[in-house]
Amino acid sequence: MTRYIFVTGGVVSSLGKGIASASLAAILEARGLKVTILKLDPYINVDPGTMSPFQHGEVFVTEDGAETDLDLGHYERFIRTPMTKRNNFTTGRVYEEVIRKERRGDYLGGTVQVIPHITDEIKRRVVEGAAGADVALIEVGGTVGDIESLPFLEACRQLKVEVGSQRALFMHLTLVPYIATAGEIKTKPTQHSVKEMRSIGLQPDILLCRSEHEVDASSRRKIALFTNVEERAVIPMQDARSIYAIPRMLHEYGLDQLVIERFGLDAREADLSEWDAVVDSLMNPQDEVTIAMVGKYMELLDAYKSLIESLLHAGIKTRTKVNINYIDSEDIERDGTSVLESADAILVPGGFGERGVEGKIRTVQYARENKVPYLGICLGMQVAVIEYARNVAGLKDAHSTEFREHTPEPVVGLITEWLDATGEKEERTEESDLGGTMRLGAQDCVLTEGSTIVGCYGKKTIRERHRHRYEVNNHFLPRLEEAGLQISGRSADGKLVEVVEAPDHPWFVACQFHPEFTSTPRDGHPLFKGFVEAALANKKGS
């Protein structure tokens, strides 16, 4: 039988519920338990797929092609269980399903209400997503007290009543601020946050106390007294050197043992040696490199969360400190490429829309002509093709129809037909909705023998995740290949270009897929590892 841990947040948002949930899950997994994590998002969008990166940050793509919250990226980086479309749902998704049932007549003419219909649908999805796990952590987005979260919290309350307190508990993450002028931490915000929980019928069983400073024993006793939480269940969670040090921190405070005892589970001792090795490598690098990342969402780095972590993971695997220089592509358009001169390697990530595209194209040209290691991802591959077409193949008007609908030389165009993650044929037109209409999820890719990328992976057939609706136009491939561009990866059916490489260059790889979605701190990723190694070689050779 599955046990449920409902994770809520109080006082302020962005305290790190996702990291806390993932860290506890990692410890429980290290004790031999099968775990999973769900994220319940209270916004009315059906999914984050059409939301601006400035609003929401990264859209994380799962193996089965779901566009989900970036917290699912944290979950996959901390535990071995792959996330699916069942691990994340929103208010919009819930209401969409309930309204569909009402239109179909499933409610037999009854009045459709938040309770029981919306809460029942939430409970159904939680139980479905948690099926098969020994322990499921359910992270409720937002902050206790927000009107948007109320249906989710009520559904969690009901589910705990239904399964019993031996199979469910509430873990509340709250802020314990340090007031510098007073020289002490303050517990009052936590007390008020728990009071807010009680007002809707919820009593936390565990409190995680986020603070810049250690929450001392006397403060924990005070919190326990005024919140009706067992003292040993008031767990400090102060700022750490790295998020990957948090599993060890929480384990030393006894959080996992508390959960094991509460649920009556039989579990072995936690083996956190892999996490200790990750932190040791991260904190004791033997070299360092500087990567220039040229994108258009630099005002909110969460838009590139998985990518930033992937470079960090590559540094862990190579014992290299990876310094990232974040550069807005519009700055390249305005001021030129001199800002790239200090970089040991250059990366252009994915993105949407015309703004900043010419700056990315100029970045590619700089990397190609100056033999600087280059990694292009998604749009980063498309601009690499455009740059090569213009400056090497002689297609001076080369562009993408995403940015120039009537360009005379559309070297990148809309995909109209492809196979999805399950092998089913998908078709799209210019009139299709934006939401959920991209080529999404894991796809097989066949690499070319002798290419740089096959040297990274060490095998010819790989499987990586996609999120795009534009592709290289096959009509122009003969002209591009004649000019020297190497097509070093194609889709399994051979119809879509997945990887290109530039000739006579030490390391120039551009891929249509998103390798950052499968990188983890314990395993790294072969493409990012190869990229950082190329940056090291360039640094030492310069």
Swiss-Prot record:
Mechanisms controlling activity: Allosterically activated by GTP, when glutamine is the substrate; GTP has no effect on the reaction when ammonia is the substrate. The allosteric effector GTP functions by stabilizing the protein conformation that binds the tetrahedral intermediate(s) formed during glutamine hydrolysis. Inhibited by the product CTP, via allosteric rather than competitive inhibition.
Residues the record lists as binding UTP: S13, K186, T187, K188, P189, T190, Q191, K222
Region annotation (Amidoligase domain) ranges: 1-265
EC number(s) reported in the record: 6.3.4.2
Enzyme class, first EC level, given as a word: ligase
Residues reported to bind CTP: S13, D146, I147, E148, K186, T187, K188, P189, T190, Q191, K222
Active site: C378, H514, E516
Catalytic activity as recorded in UniProt: UTP + L-glutamine + ATP + H2O = CTP + L-glutamate + ADP + phosphate + 2 H(+); L-glutamine + H2O = L-glutamate + NH4(+); UTP + NH4(+) + ATP = CTP + ADP + phosphate + 2 H(+)
Positions of the Glutamine amidotransferase type-1 domain: 290-541
GO biological process: 'de novo' CTP biosynthetic process; pyrimidine nucleobase biosynthetic process
UniProt binding sites for L-glutamine: G351, L379, G380, M381, Q382, E402, R469
Entries under Pfam families matching the protein: CTP_synth_N (PF06418), GATase (PF00117)
List of residues binding Mg(2+): D71, E139
UniProt-listed InterPro entries: Class_I_gatase-like, CTP_synthase, CTP_synthase_N, GATASE, GATase1_CTP_Synthase, P-loop_NTPase
Residues the entry annotates as binding ATP: S14, L15, G16, K17, G18, I19, D71
Pathway entry: Pyrimidine metabolism; CTP biosynthesis via de novo pathway; CTP from UDP: step 2/2
Note from the entry: CTPSs have evolved a hybrid strategy for distinguishing between UTP and CTP. The overlapping regions of the product feedback inhibitory and substrate sites recognize a common feature in both compounds, the triphosphate moiety. To differentiate isosteric substrate and product pyrimidine rings, an additional pocket far from the expected kinase/ligase catalytic site, specifically recognizes the cytosine and ribose portions of the product inhibitor.
Database matches in HAMAP family: PyrG (MF_01227)
Quaternary state and interactors: Homotetramer.
Family to which this protein belongs: Belongs to the CTP synthase family.
Protein name in the entry: CTP synthase
Organism, scientific name: Marinobacter nauticus (strain ATCC 700491 / DSM 11845 / VT8) (Marinobacter aquaeolei)
Gene behind the chain: pyrG
